[in-house]
Curated annotation (Swiss-Prot):
In the hair cortex, hair keratin intermediate filaments are embedded in an interfilamentous matrix, consisting of hair keratin-associated proteins (KRTAP), which are essential for the formation of a rigid and resistant hair shaft through their extensive disulfide bond cross-linking with abundant cysteine residues of hair keratins. The matrix proteins include the high-sulfur and high-glycine-tyrosine keratins. The keyword Oxidoreductase does not apply. The gene is KRTAP4-7. Interacts with hair keratins. Expressed in the hair follicles. It comes from the Eukaryota. GO terms for cellular component: cytosol; keratin filament. Belongs to the KRTAP type 4 family. Residues 5-123 are annotated as: 20 X 5 AA repeats of C-C-[GIKRQVHEML]-[SPTRV]-[STVQRCP]. This is Keratin-associated protein 4-7.
Amino acid sequence: MVSSCCGSVCSDQGCSQDLCQETCCRPSCCQTTCCRTTCYRPSCCVSSCCRPQCCQSVCCQPTCCRPTCCETTCCHPRCCISSCCRPSCCMSSCCKPQCCQSVCCQPTCCRPSCCRPCCCLRPVCGRVSCHTTCYRPTCVISTCPRPLCCASSCC
């Protein structure tokens, strides 16, 4: 019965909750009704199955990087899209320009593209937040005017 659920019937009509077994977790079976705890499998991670309850660590695939999937367990480098800019996603591999929010101003986020005024909040230069890659004109504000921050692009 479960095997037959993993065919066109499941793809067209979806599986009932009691039929969502591990053997039924195939891309064609990832309909709304199939997003249950037994269906959190990598093979189920398709765009049509990216529901909030399906955002487990095994489901962090490129096709599953959706705003509703932006949870702590889904903060993998491949999930760092603009809609995934959350505090829990602030890791070095996730430091993209669109992720440079004030909540993302961490030492690992000091990249040239991340040097925005909201990231220049520490007055003492030479500490972890004052990397050479962050010495940009946009970083020269009253709270970060020390000589150590005056790189050629900042003068």
